């Protein structure tokens, strides 16, 4: 154990657990959990090629921000323009110095921000990418968003070769539709963050 400041850290254990991954072996995709709170519905897609229901998501463009990727991919795959939600998302992101409370000398930043309202991502799903022909570990970042499920989606927004059908389903039915447990968990996290931020879901 080595002492660094006030902390004792096992540098050998850190070294053993640390891994380097070249950029071409790291897959980053982004998507949204888009909810119509008035009608308690969530936007999903039916992937005709894979024959499964999924959340809308997709790969980043070069130098594109992750946040922009999530909104773009949602629109491309569904035709719906989602509006991102500012929520009390528990996050390890830090406040900039100018936004820190003036609590005097010795104030330590919290490890987790619990109640700060932001448009941070709500969670991730991670897995080895089975569709990649070379080694790739994929992480999908999700943001909470909203949209009117009765609005008319834009046409011809999907990329060539995509064959996806957008669907609005009742939030109560996500476990009947979504193929992956991790995506079910993401939807539940979005609902939880919305409720703890004061949003009413399914209440006229």
Regions found by a protein language model. Give the residues of each.
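Charged phosphate-binding loop/patch that engages nucleotide di/tri-phosphates or the phosphate backbone
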Residues: 172-204
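Acidic, metal-coordinating catalytic segment for phosphate/diphosphate chemistry
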Residues: 1-32
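Short small-residue beta-strand/loop micro-motif enriched in glycine and branched aliphatics
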Residues: 52-56
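Short connector loops at helix/strand junctions that flank enzyme active sites
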Residues: 27, 50, 136-140
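Unchanged
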Residues: 58-185
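Short, acidic/hydrophobic/Gly-rich beta-strand patch recurrent on exposed beta strands
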Residues: 44-47
């Amino acid at each position: 154990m080595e002492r660094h400041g006030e902390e004792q850290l096992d540098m050998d254990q850190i070294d053993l657990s640390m891994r380097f991954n070249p950029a071409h072996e790291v897959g980053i995709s982004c998507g949204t959990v888009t909810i119509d709170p008035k009608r308690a519905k969530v936007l999903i897609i039916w992937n005709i090629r894979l024959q499964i229901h999924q959340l809308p998501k997709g790969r980043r463009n070069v130098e594109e921000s992750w946040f922009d990727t999530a909104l773009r991919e949602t629109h491309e795959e569904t035709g719906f323009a989602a509006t991102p939600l500012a929520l009390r998302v528990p996050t390890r992101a830090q406040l900039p110095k100018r936004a820190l409370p003036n609590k005097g000398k010795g104030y330590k930043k919290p490890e987790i921000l619990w109640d700060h309202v932001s448009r941070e991502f709500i969670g991730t799903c991670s897995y080895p990418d089975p569709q990649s022909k070379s080694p790739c570990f994929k992480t999908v970042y999700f943001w909470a968003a909203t949209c009117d499920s009765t609005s008319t989606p834009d046409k011809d927004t999907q990329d060539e070769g995509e064959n996806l059908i957008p669907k609005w389903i009742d939030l109560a039915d996500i476990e009947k539709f979504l193929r992956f447990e991790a995506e079910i968990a993401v939807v539940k996290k979005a609902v939880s963050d919305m409720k703890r931020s004061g949003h009413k879901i399914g209440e006229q």
